[in-house]
């Protein structure tokens, strides 16, 4: 590369950094809700040595001559820029670049009974009798993970390229990014391609980075990487870092005639067939076929005909490597099957069974009849804690296609994990499985399906009878203790919350009558509420919620309601009479239906789950329409359909059935109103803004805080223009240290309360106090008052214009510098006009009644009382106890917050103070 070429390249990178800064500005109020800017972006003026991911990508790209967009897009498609604290994926990928390291001690060196049991999924006793465990073991032993495979040691290779240790690349983001950049450059050179400054020229390296041994997989990964480059990506990582990849629609990938592929000792090629798959996935097909004796590992059918409609899609993991799983699932002697298998490294989808046929995957015949099974590679590497981005994306694309094709609702009652498949009968406990397990990110997965679950929301009050979706965050805020075989695993984000018999972590863990394992065991889901499930609230307290769960009132930690999302339009189910009704693990027809069809009944067709009961007074969410009990006979190609109607319900972690004749249906209770509750906003020392949602109770006026966004330290004044309601309404203005005023309009969304800021204008640095005064002139718009440094008070009426809504200022009067605090409280006197509270330097509080006059709207002050200099913050959030009168909040110098109830007295309207609680000293702004 010539010296001038390198200068041009450097110039382009500087421009790229500027583009990142532009993206940062464009994300105000969107990427991080109401954040004034994206910190740590390339070109944002951060000091040299900055350790932000954005800077690490820029530095590594420069060092190894890799376009930064390529490096960032590859990382995003591997891990979404997550480090996972150095923990491996379920297939041995590490850190932000997804580099692999799998040694012999990381994977089972022999086939376990649990692996074999995973393939015994027919749920049919006569089929289970023929399950050949020895044959399955034999197949799996031939396909044990080859830890000498270079595809499983990209981390070691990349570490060598940067002369670093494997441990550093595993655990340090900067080392991981440098190693990934070096490996991309190495792959580009191996392909005989130039280290071009054009992103589109890097197709060979990107495809090779996928570690796919097949062209379809390599092309799929490259396609997604270049889509990220063209469309841009942005994210806030679990560590709280904001990262942005600016969109560059001009990039056109240059695909070589021979796409570089990873070498593999034994690559299984697909048969020539047309897959039932979206075109963009370019799926493989390797169908299981009967052997010469006619033995097969599935049941032939003609779905969705003959009443065999497809109602659900079941998510599995393989508990083994890709090659071994593919061999077992396509071997007619394997005993188990599934419709699809998704490889971890590149997201390649292989169809193994036509969807018209019944796969033996769920261990429950009703689910097998009416569901499609999708397996995901995962071979239980020690400490494996996350699934690859390519698996998530391919799976979501496939499942969305299948759901649309077969009319399957895209919700968590129809897109379920294997662990949510019901126990068929009391005798079927051995058929239960717990994949996809606690580390499958259901919240993210459902968002890829276009059905966001409402996780990471602001929460709110709940009431009994209300339907909620449980959405614990898949972040470091939710890292419950887990054990496997009694051995603790390291803390990491998980997709569940623990259930207790009382609202306390010190309470007794919930017990499932069918489980004997310890409550912290990952396989014991009887005391765990999984993300995405919908339940009926049995009781609600501030930070704890009880739901009806498996015949019990089960409590889980739900800070401020933030681990749930209200569900509207849901139907609840209750017992019709006073007597408890049976719960069924499958929906089989009544005995008479078999007789009428001329087929033999199984003998346990009427069996229920006897250790469960659905009692009067309890309530559960209906999980689908009522269906007639049915039972498919593959040998006769006939579906036995009964007359008894069964209703699926979310009874506990699983979907079960009750007889329609024994229950009644009703809508869930309406959500608690948020229009008569008011919030408090606080800023911590790092500049993060927090929202405290009002409860409407004077004794406990606020719910657990909710993070609005970072970057607010750049403002030296912030004031609400109106009361900030719990429903996300209410505007705010903020002044930068440069004197520029910005307007934040309320969105009406509690989880994203402010829209992107609007620039009002400069010159506001002349004021030492800005105060949103509510609607001063009864025109329906909130106004602003400002005090200049000489003590003159000015009124800015709101015209409704944008971006500057304020009319020319009007002088209210002088002498206001005698006060060291001005407080906007709203209407204190009941005349419909907003009043003003002021504290003088001796600690006396004064009330200024609004007369409606102009230009000075305030009457002669009235003395409230002395002693108020004990407080360093006083604000008037509005009516906090729902009695129709605005109250006062004050923080003393020790950090204790106090509530002053408005009694409607005059001139002193306040009752004796009530402590809200301590710990508020960490905030440098409360409004």
Q: Across the structure, where does each feature detected by a protein language model lie?
A:
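C-terminal region of N-terminal signal peptides and the immediate post-cleavage residues
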Residues: 13-16, 28-49, 233, 237, ...
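N-terminal export and membrane-targeting signals
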Residues: 2-22
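Intrinsically disordered, low-complexity linker and terminal regions at domain boundaries
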Residues: 559-601
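SH3/SH3-like beta-barrel superfamily modules
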Residues: 527-559, 610-666
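Catalytic glycan-binding domains that act on GlcNAc-containing polysaccharides
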Residues: 48-231
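Trp/Gly-enriched beta-strand/coil motifs that build multi-repeat beta-propeller-like domains
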Residues: 669-927
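Basic/polar, cationic surfaces and motifs that engage anionic cell-wall
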Residues: 215, 221-281, 285-287, 383-492
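N-terminal catalytic cores of peptidoglycan-degrading enzymes
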Residues: 47-52, 241-363, 552, 558-560, ...
């Amino acid at each position: 590369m010539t010296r001038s070429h390198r200068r041009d390249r450097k110039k382009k990178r500087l421009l790229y950094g500027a583009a990142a800064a532009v993206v940062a500005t464009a994300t105000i109020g969107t990427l991080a809700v109401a954040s004034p800017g994206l910190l740590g972006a390339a070109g944002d003026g951060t000091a040299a040595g900055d350790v932000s991911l954005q800077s690490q990508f820029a530095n590594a790209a420069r060092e190894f001559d890799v376009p930064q967009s390529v490096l960032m897009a590859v990382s995003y498609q591997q891990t979404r820029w997550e480090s996972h604290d150095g923990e491996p994926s379920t297939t041995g990928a590490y850190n932000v670049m997804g580099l692999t390291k799998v040694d012999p001690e990381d994977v089972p060196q022999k086939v376990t009974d649990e692996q074999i049991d995973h393939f015994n999924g027919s749920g049919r006793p006569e089929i289970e009798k023929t399950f050949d465990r020895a044959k399955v073991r034999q197949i799996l032993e031939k396909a044990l993970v080859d830890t000498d495979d270079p595809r499983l040691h990209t981390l070691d290779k990349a570490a060598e390229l940067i002369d670093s240790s494997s441990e550093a690349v595993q655990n340090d983001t900067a080392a991981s990014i440098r190693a990934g950049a070096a490996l991309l450059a190495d792959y580009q050179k191996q392909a005989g391609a130039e280290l071009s400054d054009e992103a589109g020229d890097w197709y060979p390296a990107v495809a090779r980075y996928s570690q796919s041994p097949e062209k379809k997989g390599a092309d799929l990964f490259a396609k997604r990487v270049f889509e990220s480059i063209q469309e841009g990506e942005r994210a806030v990582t679990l560590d709280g870092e904001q990262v942005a990849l600016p969109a560059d629609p001009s990039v056109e990938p240059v695909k070589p005639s021979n796409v570089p592929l990873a070498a593999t000792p034994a690559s299984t090629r697909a048969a020539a067939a047309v897959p039932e798959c979206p075109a963009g996935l370019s799926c493989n097909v390797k169908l299981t076929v009967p052997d010469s004796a006619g033995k097969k590992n599935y049941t032939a059918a003609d779905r969705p005909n003959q009443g065999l409609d497809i109602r659900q899609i079941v998510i599995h993991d393989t508990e083994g490597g890709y090659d071994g799983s593919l061999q077992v699932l396509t071997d007619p002697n394997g005993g188990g099957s599934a419709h699809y298998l998704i490889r971890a490294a590149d997201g390649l989808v292989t169809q193994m069974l036509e969807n018209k046929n019944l796969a033996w995957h769920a261990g429950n015949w009703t689910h097998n009849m009416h569901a499609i099974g999708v397996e995901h590679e995962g071979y239980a590497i020690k400490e494996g804690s996350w699934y690859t981005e390519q698996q998530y994306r391919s799976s979501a694309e496939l499942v969305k296609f299948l759901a649309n094709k077969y009319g399957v609702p895209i919700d968590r009652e129809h897109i379920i994990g294997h662990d949510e498949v019901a126990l068929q009968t009391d005798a079927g406990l051995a058929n239960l499985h717990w994949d996809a397990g606690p580390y499958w990110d259901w919240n993210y997965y459902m968002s890829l399906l276009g059905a966001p679950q409402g996780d990471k929301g602001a929460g709110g009050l709940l009431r009994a009878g209300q339907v909620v979706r449980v959405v614990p965050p898949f972040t470091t805020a939710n890292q419950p203790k887990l054990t496997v075989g009694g051995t603790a695993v390291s803390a990491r984000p998980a997709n569940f919350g623990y259930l207790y018999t009382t609202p306390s972590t010190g309470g007794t863990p919930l017990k499932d009558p069918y489980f004997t394992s310890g409550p912290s065991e990952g396989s014991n889901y009887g005391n765990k509420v999984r993300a995405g499930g919908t339940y009926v609230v049995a009781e609600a307290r501030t930070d704890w919620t009880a739901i009806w769960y498996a015949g019990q009132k089960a409590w889980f930690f739900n800070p401020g309601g933030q681990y749930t999302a209200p569900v509207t339009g849901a139907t609840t189910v209750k017992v019709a009479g006073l007597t408890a009704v049976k719960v069924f693990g499958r929906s089989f027809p009544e005995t008479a239906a078999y007789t009428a069809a001329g087929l033999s009944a199984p003998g346990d067709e009427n069996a229920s789950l006897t250790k469960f009961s659905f009692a009067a007074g309890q309530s559960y969410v209906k999980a689908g329409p009522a269906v007639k009990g049915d039972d498919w006979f593959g040998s006769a190609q006939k579906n036995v359909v009964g007359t008894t109607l069964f209703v699926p319900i979310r009874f506990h972690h699983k979907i079960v059935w009750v007889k329609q004749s024994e229950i009644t249906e009703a809508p869930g209770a309406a959500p608690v109103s948020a229009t008569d509750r008011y919030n408090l906003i606080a800023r911590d020392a790092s500049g993060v803004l927090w929202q405290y949602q009002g409860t409407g109770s004077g004794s406990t006026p606020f719910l657990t805080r909710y993070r609005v966004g970072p970057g607010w330290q750049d403002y030296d004044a912030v004031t609400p223009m109106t009361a900030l309601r719990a429903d996300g309404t209410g505007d705010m203005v903020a002044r930068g240290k440069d004197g520029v005023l910005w307007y934040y309009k309320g969105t009406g969304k509690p989880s994203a309360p402010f829209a992107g800021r609007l620039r009002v204008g400069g010159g506001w640095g002349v004021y030492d106090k800005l105060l949103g005064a509510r609607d001063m002139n009864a025109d329906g718009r909130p106004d602003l008052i400002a005090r200049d440094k000489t003590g003159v008070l000015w009124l800015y009426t709101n015209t409704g214009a944008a971006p500057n809504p304020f009319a020319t200022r009007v002088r209210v009067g002088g002498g206001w510098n005698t006060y060291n605090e001005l407080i906007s409280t709203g209407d204190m006197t009941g005349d419909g006009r907003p009043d003003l509270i002021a504290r003088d330097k001796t600690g006396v509080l004064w009330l200024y009644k609004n007369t409606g006059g102009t230009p000075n709207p305030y009457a002669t002050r009235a003395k409230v009382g002395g002693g108020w200099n004990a407080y360093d913050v006083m604000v008037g959030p509005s009516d906090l106890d729902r009695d129709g009168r605005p109250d006062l909040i004050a923080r003393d110098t020790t950090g204790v917050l106090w509530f002053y109830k408005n009694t409607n007295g005059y001139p002193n309207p306040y009752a004796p103070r009530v402590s809200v609680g301590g710990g508020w000293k960490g905030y440098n702004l409360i409004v």
